[in-house]
Swiss-Prot record:
InterPro entries, per the entry: Ribosomal_bS21, Ribosomal_bS21_sf
Gene: rpsU
UniProt KW keywords: Ribonucleoprotein, Ribosomal protein
Database matches in Pfam families: Ribosomal_S21
GO terms, molecular function: structural constituent of ribosome
Gene Ontology cellular-component terms listed: ribonucleoprotein complex; ribosome
Presence of keyword Ribosomal protein: yes
Gene Ontology biological-process entries: translation
Protein name stated in the entry: Small ribosomal subunit protein bS21
Family membership noted in the UniProt record: Belongs to the bacterial ribosomal protein bS21 family.
Signal peptide segment: none
Length: 74
């Protein structure tokens, strides 16, 4: 569980925002959503593979854009 230090002069909304950010970084909500329902192992593999393909496509697109920028620069 993420913990934050709240000085006396800080407002509640600032502390809440910092706590939410800490929870997001720790991955608590995503983990909760994953274990909320049982997911079959085949579905889990399929989801992870789709995420990997998406990451790879995004990486390729960034590389292509960088190449295009290099070509147009000269």
């Amino acid at each position: 569980m993420p913990m934050i230090d709240v000085p006396d002069n800080n407002a509640f909304d600032v502390a809440m925002r910092r706590f939410k950010r800490a929870c997001e970084k720790a991955g608590i909500l995503s983990k909760l959503r994953q274990i909320e329902y049982y997911e079959k192992p085949t579905s889990k593999r399929k989801r992870k593979r789709a995420a990997a393909v998406k990451r790879y496509a995004k990486k390729l697109q960034k590389e292509q854009e960088a190449l295009e920028r290099e070509r147009t620069r000269y």
